[in-house]
Amino acid sequence: MAKSPSNNAAQRVRKKVRKNVADGIAHVHASFNNTIITITDRQGNALSWASSGGQGFKGSRKSTPFAAQVASEVAGRAAIEQGIKNLDVEIKGPGPGRESSVRALGALGIRINSIADVTPVPHNGCRPQKRRRI
């Protein structure tokens, strides 16, 4: 005989843990196709994250500076709820959302201590892909 669904599944849902962290790091990964913003504490534990695609932008609109700005605002508001007041920003990648995402974080009232470019640069490592011809 089949059992009826119980309310145990509803009871197992965890409440969001509200951390009280004042300082953090904003990791901005700006590729040519998307922009992903992750806000962590000093140890690297993620507090909030957002991406351009996750905010409803699809296709070529994901890679616009406006989409990066919207994603930064969403991640920044969630981080402010966790208690973030100061951020160090680490930008990785060559995408168009680099600058607008940092400006959006500053406009939210978060104090930006430093901005660092941590784009990985090969010391002549792997052979690059062939040139794209259109």
Curated annotation (Swiss-Prot):
GO terms for biological process: translation. It holds the Pfam family Ribosomal_S11. Keywords: Ribonucleoprotein, Ribosomal protein, RNA-binding, rRNA-binding. Gene3D superfamilies: Ribosomal protein S11. GO terms for cellular component: ribonucleoprotein complex; ribosome. It comes from the Bacteria. The keyword Cell cycle does not apply. One of its GO terms (molecular function) is structural constituent of ribosome. Located on the platform of the 30S subunit, it bridges several disparate RNA helices of the 16S rRNA. Forms part of the Shine-Dalgarno cleft in the 70S ribosome. Belongs to the universal ribosomal protein uS11 family. Part of the 30S ribosomal subunit. Interacts with proteins S7 and S18. Binds to IF-3. This is Small ribosomal subunit protein uS11. It comes from Polaromonas sp. (strain JS666 / ATCC BAA-500).
